[in-house]
């Protein structure tokens, strides 16, 4: 494996979300991937996020919202209903790579006190970050990750040299709209 440590990236996302103040409530947005909500490829990242919150802010309430990635109207309605019932919640996170799915809601319902953290530098996530709807993205430098993975693959195929470690973690980048132009 070549990439970021998913557990640590989740903990870093939680740190960024909570670094400014004492947090009482967090909206954790998850994707509906199957009817029983069992498919969860981002579980290690989410566990890192939740463990950090539990250790650092044990009084914090986590509100989990499920949205369907292919139903933007449903996602908007879910967020609208939640924030109508919980206007005090100012901290949002999504531990998969599709924070852009809530961008329409964030754009149409601005709140200067809201802090939103997402993961991965997909073009649509970067656009949301650039527009100020997302505060931080935790990501990795994909060209470096790709270079290391391809080099290891080539050395294995050509030279017969296996990687020294099973997991080869790369550094994590913290993106904000103020450093986005240089990324």
Where are these predicted regions, by residue range?
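Hydrophobic alpha-helical
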Residues: 49, 63-124
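Hydrophobic alpha-helical segments within soluble ligand-binding/sensing domains
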Residues: 2-27, 75-76, 125, 140-158
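Short beta-strand segments enriched in small/hydrophobic residues
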Residues: 25-37
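Short beta-strand/turn micro-motifs composed of small residues
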Residues: 27-30, 118-120, 176
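Short, solvent-exposed amphipathic alpha-helices that sit
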Residues: 9-12, 39-60, 74, 78, ...
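Non-catalytic structural scaffold of enzyme domains
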Residues: 17-21, 36, 47-57, 103, ...
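Hinge/cleft segment of the Venus flytrap/periplasmic-binding protein
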Residues: 37-38, 144-183
């Amino acid at each position: 494996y070549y990439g970021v440590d998913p557990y640590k990236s989740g903990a870093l996302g939680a740190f960024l979300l909570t670094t400014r103040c004492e947090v009482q409530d967090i909206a954790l947005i998850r994707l509906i991937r199957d009817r029983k909500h069992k498919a969860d490829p981002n579980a290690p990242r989410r566990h890192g996020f939740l463990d950090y919150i539990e250790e650092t802010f044990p009084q914090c309430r986590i509100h989990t919202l499920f949205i369907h990635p292919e139903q933007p109207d449903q996602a908007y309605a879910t967020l609208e209903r939640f924030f109508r019932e919980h206007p005090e919640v100012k901290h949002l996170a999504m531990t998969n790579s599709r924070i852009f799915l809530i961008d329409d809601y964030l754009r149409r319902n601005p709140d200067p006190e809201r802090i939103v953290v997402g993961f991965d530098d997909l073009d649509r996530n970067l656009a949301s970050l650039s527009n100020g709807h997302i505060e931080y993205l935790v990501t990795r430098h994909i060209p470096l990750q790709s270079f290391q993975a391809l080099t290891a693959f080539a050395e294995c195929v050509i030279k017969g040299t296996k990687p020294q470690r099973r997991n080869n973690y790369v550094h994590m980048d913290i993106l904000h709209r103020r450093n986005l132009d240089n990324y």
